[in-house]
Amino acid sequence: MKPLMLQGHERAITQIKYNREGDLIFSTAKDHKPSVWFSLNGERLGTFNGHQGAVWCVDVDWTTTRLITGSGDMSTKLWDVETGSVLGTIPCNSAARTVNFSYSGNQASYSTDKAMGHNCELFIIDVRNVDSSISNQSPVLKLTMNQQSKITSMLWGALDETVITGHENGSIRIWDLRAAKELNSVNDHTLNINDMQLSSDGTMLVSASKDATAKLFDSESLMCLKTYKTERPVNSAAISPIHEHVVLGGGQEAMEVTTTSTKAGKFDSRFFHLVYEEEFARVKGHFGPINSLAFHPDGKSYATGGEDGFVRVQVFDASYYDFVFE
């Protein structure tokens, strides 16, 4: 497996996403420029210029025409993917931590941090006709986290009727958007949920937590199905679209790396069997924790974004497909 190294970001990667076809990778970092790359050869197509702070999150819609990003400059921006121009900017009361397009692409959701006297809030906005007036439009729905802890990751549920949120205290909650109320919550994790990703059919989700585990949940009932244990915080986890495999990435938090032995760092991505919960492979690469992981939609490669500012695309060898789990 010879990886592609995508060099271009000056600071740590915060999130990476493939588009639906998998020909493009979108990456955000703690520098101010979200980037788009060809996944096949690693060529950078361009950057989306306009943010004034670290960009925490990114999502691309189903047709790869629009991009949404959330930043520490207290704004969420919508972009035209083809031209790189800003379609609209939504001011926030604090840093935007998560952004997601709904499956239909008609709506988007974003959440803001609990900071500067403001509670953590979740917004649903209509993005069918986006122009500069979106900054003055009121959201379709606003949910305030009064008792709940801060939202750190978010997904849309089935048929755009629900939103699933992962929180700083390790809880995962599912919200009914029509009734604007919480349907269910589980507390299987003990620490911060760093990332959640759906399976390709949307029936399951994998969560990555600072408590050194990743867990597989039913995306409707939030029943915990499987647990993948490691000995270090998990920053990101993804489910293979073609095999019963889960890949985990993580490591120490960046600020703690120097104070631990190198052995405890373990910055490789680790493959677990989805059903048997057993680790069967590791792939080295990054000089620091992996912050974000994504499988290519065809399942033949995957990408990792690290604290070192690189995005690495790993294409699987033939031996990966021949591998039989004993």
Swiss-Prot record:
It is found in: Cytoplasm. It holds the Pfam family EIF3I. One of its GO terms (biological process) is formation of cytoplasmic translation initiation complex. GO terms for molecular function: RNA binding; translation initiation factor activity. WD repeats lie at residues 8-49, 51-91, 146-185, 188-227, 285-326. Keywords: Cytoplasm, Initiation factor, Protein biosynthesis, Repeat, WD repeat. Gene3D superfamilies: YVTN repeat-like/Quinoprotein amine dehydrogenase (2.130.10.10). GO terms for cellular component: eukaryotic 43S preinitiation complex; eukaryotic 48S preinitiation complex; eukaryotic translation initiation factor 3 complex, eIF3m. Its main location: cytoplasm. InterPro entries: eIF3i, G-protein_beta_WD-40_rep, WD40/YVTN_repeat-like_dom_sf, WD40_repeat_CS, WD40_repeat_dom_sf, WD40_rpt. Signal peptide: none annotated. Belongs to the eIF-3 subunit I family. Component of the eukaryotic translation initiation factor 3 (eIF-3) complex, which is involved in protein synthesis of a specialized repertoire of mRNAs and, together with other initiation factors, stimulates binding of mRNA and methionyl-tRNAi to the 40S ribosome. The eIF-3 complex specifically targets and initiates translation of a subset of mRNAs involved in cell proliferation. Component of the eukaryotic translation initiation factor 3 (eIF-3) complex. This is Eukaryotic translation initiation factor 3 subunit I. It comes from Aedes aegypti. The lineage of its organism: Eukaryota, Metazoa, Ecdysozoa, Arthropoda, Hexapoda.
